[in-house]
């Protein structure tokens, strides 16, 4: 089911600004090379630190193609194709990603439907050493049954390897859903698959980052009493920590919110932003860690109205976090908002980036690239199109 519905989108620009380390940043719309019909955008950084944007484009035969482009200086590279004529799973939370390993190898992962209209999901990975020629896509999971294997995230976990975190529902919608990790090498081959948590929230995306000590995975856990709070796992010195909640929200929900956590890391610094509906108060919160996720501060609420969640987060060089989320408001019902929060928990002013319907805005993504912070989302005033903007001095 294509969740991207038509709506009017507009951009709030130069008059909106926020202070960062004594300077003023403004929101600036930047054109990108994605075509009409593009959606499900995501960010990473290339080997040299430049912003790398990936997205899906609709083809004339109603299949989809995964593309990416890199912005260096003031110019985008020509869009390059990773995988063409595939049946990508078209759901805002299922974002394909492309990352660079330390040697410049690119790894891409994505989720496909085995057939049109199927709710089953298969997760794939492919690799490229030159950014032009890609290996044949490989399924990252051993199981091939027609169930969920998705909501994946990826991070480099070694010089020539990466870890993909994903969810597996072997018993279908009514059974427990497992959090799993697949290790892939620079050739796009699966090296290892392991289970990390046997019962998590079924339709909430994962988030994985690399800290100075190792991997940190943030996800929405689930207890037998249907408490759905955010938890983290840490991989240090080859061993996984026990699962730990970042905050006891105690959100009880006998359903799946399709809303999880977003994590960002910079050395020992970690910041996590997430949505909760606990106490019948829909809101977005953020916590910080100065010890790679071993401990966290008390949460700071960043949303100011009725939040829909779908958070994204980035950390700047000073340790300030920039958080984006969707909130109720505007003529079409929803707005993309961003806000800076200092490591001390001081929240800056709220900035509106765009407005539209809740579903059609997609899952906005934030990236920190050097001194620049970027955001991507989907607009469809007439047809779906990936939009990008940055915060500039």
Where are these regions (language model features)?
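Bacterial N-terminal signal peptides
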Residues: 10-19
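Extracellular, repeat-based ectodomains that mediate carbohydrate processing or recognition
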Residues: 23-393
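Bacterial N-terminal signal peptides that target proteins for export
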Residues: 2-11
């Amino acid at each position: 089911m294509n969740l991207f519905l038509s709506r009017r989108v507009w951009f709030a620009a130069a008059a909106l600004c926020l202070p960062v380390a004594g300077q003023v940043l403004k929101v600036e719309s930047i054109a990108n090379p994605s075509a009409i019909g593009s959606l499900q955008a995501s960010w990473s950084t290339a080997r040299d630190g430049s912003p790398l944007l990936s997205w899906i484009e609709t083809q004339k035969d109603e299949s989809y193609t995964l593309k990416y482009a890199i912005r260096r200086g003031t110019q985008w590279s020509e869009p390059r194709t990773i995988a063409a004529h595939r049946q990508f799973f078209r759901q805002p939370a299922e974002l394909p990603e492309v990352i660079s390993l330390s040697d410049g190898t690119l790894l891409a992962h994505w989720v496909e439907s085995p057939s049109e209209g199927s709710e089953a999901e298969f997760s794939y990975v492919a690799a490229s050493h030159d950014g032009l020629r890609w290996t044949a896509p490989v399924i990252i999971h051993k199981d091939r049954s027609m169930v969920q294997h998705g909501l994946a995230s990826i991070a480099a976990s070694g010089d020539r390897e990466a870890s993909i975190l994903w969810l597996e529902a072997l018993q279908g919608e009514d059974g427990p859903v497992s959090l799993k990790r697949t290790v892939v090498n620079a050739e796009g081959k699966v090296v290892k698959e392991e289970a990390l948590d046997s019962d998590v929230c079924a339709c909430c995306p994962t988030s994985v980052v690399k800290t100075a000590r190792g991997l940190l995975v943030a996800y929405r856990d689930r207890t037998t009493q249907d408490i759905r709070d955010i938890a983290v796992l840490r991989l240090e010195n080859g061993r996984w920590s026990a699962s730990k909640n970042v905050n006891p929200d105690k959100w009880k929900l006998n359903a799946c919110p399709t809303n999880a956590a977003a994590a960002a890391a910079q050395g020992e610094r970690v910041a996590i932003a997430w949505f909760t509906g606990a106490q019948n108060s829909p809101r977005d919160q953020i916590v910080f860690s100065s010890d790679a996720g071993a401990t966290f501060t008390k949460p700071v609420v960043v949303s100011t109205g009725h939040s829909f969640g779908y958070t994204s987060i980035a950390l700047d060089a000073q340790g300030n976090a920039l958080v984006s989320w969707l909130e109720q408001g505007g003529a079409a019902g929803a707005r993309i908002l961003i806000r800076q929060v200092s490591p001390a928990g001081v929240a800056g002013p709220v900035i509106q980036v765009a407005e539209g319907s809740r579903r059609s805005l997609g899952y906005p993504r934030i990236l920190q690239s050097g001194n620049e912070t970027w955001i991507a989302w989907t607009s469809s005033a007439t047809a779906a199109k990936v939009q990008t903007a940055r915060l500039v001095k």
